[in-house]
Amino acid sequence: MTFLGYPPAEHLLGDLGMAAEITSETTARVRTRATPQIASADGGVRAGVLATLVDVVGGAIAARVLRPDWMATADLALEVVGPVPGPWVEARGSLLRRGRTTLVVEALVVGVDEDGNDLVVDGRAPDPVAWASMTFAVLPTQDASSGGRPSPELPTRWAFSGGGLDLPVLEALPVTVLDGPAGRLSIPARPYLHNSFGAVQGGVVALLAEAAGAEALGAAQGRDASDMVVTDLQIAYLALAKVGPIVSSARVLATGTDGRAGAVVELHDAGAGHRLTTVVNVTAVPAEHFDPTVV
């Protein structure tokens, strides 16, 4: 099933198998199954996939609140405070503010069962394992009749159905490593990765930035990228990435005593005059040092 005609039949969101529910006029939740194909070095769902999840839940809320106007993601911040093992992982979003030109959504990420029920550990539901916020730019419509009316019946449910991932998500994009220590990676701008504007989807951008940061930060510590867990993403979306390939570069910042380090990742659209499309602050830590109590 699609939401407002998006995504197409063959698309990453469908292969991630996301199930969504608009729970009120200003809240929604979206979940996906935690599989080895989307796992990070800590065994939990990787930060780029969590960013994709919260981008979708934020977009679902914004689309309902703003219709007939539309929106584009301006920035997204994600903080992961512990491994996200599943069996399903769910982003629960709520509207924080609607202004004339921007809209802000907050999301908490929790582990749930297949029906979306909280997992119970020692008689209580666990605390959220990640937090995110998103700012959307409001795009006024030129045709007030074009957006239709949202369904008055709540909750509204739908699912993005696809064939599933039979290989790691970075290979499915696919990500090509050009120069790991420099954080130079690339992905094509193909329909499988597009958003509703025909540009690379915001969650895919997060996945590329996560991978680029892990490559550069791992190399700076004499480690492989697969040893690093990305815990924080702060993403500024500056321009649409439409032509491709989309190429990243990374500048490594200081490293803490526990191996925690940061990098600034920039993404450029090589086919559009190397236009700067995205800037991302990435924080990562070696998997063996990922202690949720100190994140």
Residue ranges of model-derived segments:
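Terminal targeting signals and extreme-terminal segments of soluble enzymes
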Residues: 1-295
